[in-house]
Amino acid sequence: MLILRGAPALSAFRHSKLLEQLKQKVSAVSGLYAEFAHFADVNDVLTSEEQQVLDRLLKYGPSVPVQEPSGRLFLVLPRFGTISPWSSKASDIARNCGLTKIQRIERGIAFYVEGQFSEAQAQAIADSLHDRMTQLVLGDHEQAASLFSHAQPKPLTAVDILGGGRAALEKANVELGLALAEDEIDYLITSFNGLGRNPHDIELMMFAQANSEHCRHKIFNASWDIDGQSQEKSLFGMIKNTYQMHSEGVLSAYKDNASVIVGNVAGRFFPDPETRQYGAVQEPVHILMKVETHNHPTAIAPFPGAATGSGGEIRDEGATGRGAKPKAGLTGFTVSNLQIPGFVQPWEVPYGKPERIVTALDIMIEGPLGGAAFNNEFGRPALTGYFRTFEQSITTPHGDEVRGYHKPIMLAGGMGNIREDHVQKGEITVGSKLIVLGGPAMLIGLGGGAASSMATGTSSADLDFASVQRENPEMERRCQEVIDRCWQLGDRNPISFIHDVGAGGLSNAFPELVNDGDRGGRFELRNVPNDEPGMAPLEIWSNESQERYVLAVGVEDFDRFKAICERERCPFAVVGEATAEPQLTVTDSHFGNSPVDMPLEVLLGKVPRMHRSVEREAEIGDDFDPSTLDIEESVQRVLRHPAVASKSFLITIGDRSITGLVARDQMVGPWQVPVADCAVTATSFDVNTGEAMAMGERTPLALLDAPASGRMAIGETLTNIAASCIEKLSDIKLSANWMSAAGHPGEDARLYDTVKAVGMELCPELGITIPVGKDSMSMKTRWSDEGTEKSVTSPLSLIVTGFAPVVDIRQTLTPELRMDKGITDLILIDLGRGQNRMGASILAQTHGKLGRVAPDVDDAEDLKAFFAVIQGLNSDGHILSYHDRSDGGLLVSTLEMAFAGHCGLNLHLDGVADNVSELSAILFNEELGAVIQVRQDATPLVLAQFSAAGLEDCVAVIGQPINNDEVSISFHGEPVFSGQRRLLQRQWAETSYQIQRLRDNAECADQEFDALLEEDNPGLTVKLGFDVNEDIAAPYIKTGVRPQVAVLREQGVNGQVEMAAAFDRAGFNAIDVHMSDILAGRVDLNDFKGMVACGGFSYGDVLGAGEGWAKSALFNSRARDAFQGFFERADSFTLGVCNGCQMLSNLHELIPGSEFWPHFVRNRSEQFEARVAMVQVQESASIFLQGMAGSRMPIAIAHGEGHAEFRNDDALLEADVSGTVALRFVDNHGKVTETYPANPNGSPRGIGGMTTLDGRVTIMMPHPERVFRAVQNSWRPEDWNEDAAWMRMFRNARAWVN
């Protein structure tokens, strides 16, 4: 084993933060140093050349001075017997670089902690430094040799029910955490007595997972008695009623990993499977919809819990039909009170929590990072979501109890696209190969399905922790590339059947696959790819290692499938074959036995149906009179409540421009304020149709009136999605996610009544279907606190997500008030019809109250009329701005519109209030509704349209936006409230800022927060030195000659399709080229005029961002010769964007004229930054930027490592004077800046892009390929038609080739 010291592992910011955390745990800690440690398992002595290559491979990341360490060593390594995702990628890179003597490279972190401490304190330090699920801590480097030793496989065990009877099974139930019900134990004893043998532990675990509440939805399929009355339908039956009443537009419901609805026709853009040339195929592009929850793992370990939640939902989309493509995501969180240190709010009363779960604040620091990181690395934009906190002590008929979300809601959802011919699963023929695609088995996530089905606190802490999975998004990306290549083959798609591997691992996925295909299966356990050979059969079969799919591929299609996997470097294995007989057999060649041999009907068949007999409880509530409150204090409290406050800290960490198909993200207007009502994507690059999604949830209302909370969730979804341009209300389809503390007094009846209100009443009345959903029935946390039994129970929680095809993505409305449209009015549409019900409002919550009467949807006809009028007014161009009314009420809706428009408000409440005592209720009630901005001369027409639709009593003019910073509210000329817009916006932004400050570099958070005080910020602007609508490539395109450009990607790259689309539009033939094609000699770069290295996360950024990719080219002789020859050709050009920029900067020794280039390292904020930034094009030789010098315009940013690091100040100066700086970040006034967030990565002198001395090679961190169409821009000037400013760059390349 070789031991190689690495670079320091912590930036100054992370170092001081960790040191502070350690001192809080162990006050004797006085100092800390951390560096990476690398360990290489070699089968022979390396030559000096090989050693040099290895040394260069392991030199990556920013340049930080190396120290001579002192203090006690805590060496944190991957758990022995495991292979980390880092190791598998680094080992791949080493092999690609010709280091064939290296079996494996592994990495740890050597923490040196100074101070005098006891062994108990040392243990506390060790606990703080590692994740015990995947890591261990050693005291010296030599012990790391055990990383490369392999444990012997553990044997099978049986449970002796033939001899020990029921007691033996009950004991196994507890020890294995199976969560079997009494009737299931009876069923298993009967079944195995019938088979005449004892069950193996692997069979019991498989049964427990397949039949857990998580997988089987027993409560939703149960029969019910309520108050002694038998109920006609199950919960699922009432949901299905929406489909039975209105099935039009639904292509697949209730039977696959996601639902499918009818989409628009467009030119779907992808590479031809044979020629690899990108092109558009005109066809229907149908819409997938799916929303999942991952609540239990997120409570235990928020980052991996939320990451694997997002990953699992992405796999559900990809595994729909015969393979599909995820497109855009959403994330939601509900937690208990945050109690931010130094920022605790008056309504946040400490109650405590069990040791095994983390705090609400830690969930909201780590969980969103996990969800965002997975989406970012996979390459899916996260475009909408929600965030709510709720925790309150309430009085019930059974006494006082705390209701809240110690068990959080972590929602991961999204939409995708699928070909019409692939919507339905195919046939599994007898003998079909049964394949696992993706990563290896590891001992993580064991028993997750059963664990998530228990109330938090009823299982052991070890079982809880074991049930959390760990993520590897780059592997999932490779799997998706394989699925993409398969569906792109059309009727030659080799996949006949596909499922994702989720709860229960292969023990659930393979039986489900063969059972759904009306087959049985024979499997060989040792064919499962396995990175922990010491696992027992149960562990191999049931672990929930992520990023895996199971597929059935016909024998005749197998070679085609294999070739695709090899090109994409995606692991796969044939584990079994399909049989005609419905028997499940798993053999084990190592031990020569059969761990599983049972009929599928025993596993999945006749399990007893649950029956629930429950009673309704009296509704609860308390008195709340808002008229007695001080309005100014109410405004401050409401603006700081997390459900109302800015969600910026959740949004800027998530890529919102990847795919180049995003038409509306959360950030609105020139000042990029996070207030959008819905998310909108384009169907493809050649049309203006698209897809919309929006969310609705009003969970605290359920404590007062559960059915009302369900109706309001649907109502809010509709008032949100109404901002997009949809042909008719029935085009909207809903996902319903139900969370309940089943068994808690009154909660079961509330659940039943709410499902009935939604499924049997409101949705049928609206003509809307719920074709997909999910339930989580164990939303309660119990623990003992110094002998006192405590619990926190969530309210019944329905989270609704709406999806719909969009007629015109250019007509999406936003809350940005327009000050350039003359005199305008603000009109309130109050669907509560003046009732102003305050129950469970944010204002009530900020005073520790609930109130008594909840807002509700009283008449479905009002909602239908509202939707129709808004759509009509939008189509006619009358609505300038739109925002729904929700949390915080009318006051918050109008303030958010003013924040987005950077303007003041003059509101007068004369038309909506009768007396002063009503004003607080009018400003803060959360009845359904919206505020629209219209030109004053159109106001009578607009009001008339609402009157004609029966909504005359719902509408009133409430004021005007004004062109200054003042916000004033009056009633009959008397002032009610006044304030400054920017100070109110700071209050609204402060909760987000406080969390950002704890999570990221505090200096950057301070700069962003202080920027809100700037009075004359003009926002994003455009100043071009060219005509955006001129196509300078048109003469060359007319010749019919289309030069070839290699669209280059490596494993983990995810931005190739939009890059190809930009070059295709500019008149090039874009060809898909994988690095594996170059390394194998399948592609010759001499065939191309241009090459573009695309964005993403090559090798998951292992060995540095873009560095592993670059080194696999530098140290592989075939690849090095190919790249060097290409760069030296005078007729070639190259572009590198984001990850491609990082990669090319590390190839500078091969690129003539690039000696001034920097190295790109971690952003100054220490965070992934997804923003719209202003850049100015510099005077340079870049062939891409000719005729653009001096132009200033916005561009999409999405990177974690974009900080340009030069060797020293002299090198920076040389770059400056050499004329090779191509782009600089500027502030909204046009000045070059290093200030955050205008400069999102802190690069010196605003450097954002470089070129070579002759201009043929250009690299940049921003993403022009995502914003070449006008509709792709989060904000754009109105005079942009089809093209955006960045299209000129690609056309410049086409003109240069000529």
Swiss-Prot record:
Positions with a binding annotation for ATP: 305-316, 384-386, 676, 886
Localization terms from the record: Cytoplasm
EC class (word): ligase
Gene Ontology biological-process annotations: 'de novo' IMP biosynthetic process
Residues at the active site: 1138 (nucleophile), 1263, 1265
EC number(s) recorded for this UniProt protein: 6.3.5.3
Pfam family, one: GATase_5
PROSITE patterns: GATASE_TYPE_1
Binding positions (Mg(2+)): 677, 716, 720, 884
Record's catalysed reaction(s): N(2)-formyl-N(1)-(5-phospho-beta-D-ribosyl)glycinamide + L-glutamine + ATP + H2O = 2-formamido-N(1)-(5-O-phospho-beta-D-ribosyl)acetamidine + L-glutamate + ADP + phosphate + H(+)
InterPro entries recorded: Class_I_gatase-like (IPR029062), FGAR-AT_N (IPR040707), FGAR-AT_PurM_N-like (IPR055181), PurL_large (IPR010073), PurL_linker (IPR041609), PurM-like_C_dom (IPR010918), PurM-like_C_sf (IPR036676), PurM-like_N_sf (IPR036921)
Pathway entry: Purine metabolism; IMP biosynthesis via de novo pathway; 5-amino-1-(5-phospho-D-ribosyl)imidazole from N(2)-formyl-N(1)-(5-phospho-D-ribosyl)glycinamide: step 1/2
Annotated spans, Disordered: 303-327
GO terms for MF: ATP binding; metal ion binding; phosphoribosylformylglycinamidine synthase activity
Domain Glutamine amidotransferase type-1 as annotated: residue spans: 1045-1298
Keyword Nucleotide-binding attached: yes
A cellular component term, taken from the record's GO annotations: cytoplasm
NCBIfam families tied to this protein: FGAM_synt, PRK05297.1
Function recorded in the entry: Phosphoribosylformylglycinamidine synthase involved in the purines biosynthetic pathway. Catalyzes the ATP-dependent conversion of formylglycinamide ribonucleotide (FGAR) and glutamine to yield formylglycinamidine ribonucleotide (FGAM) and glutamate.
Entry similarity comment: In the N-terminal section; belongs to the FGAMS family.
Self-association and partners: Monomer.
Protein name listed in UniProt: Phosphoribosylformylglycinamidine synthase
Species this chain originates from: Pseudomonas savastanoi pv. phaseolicola (strain 1448A / Race 6) (Pseudomonas syringae pv. phaseolicola (strain 1448A / Race 6))
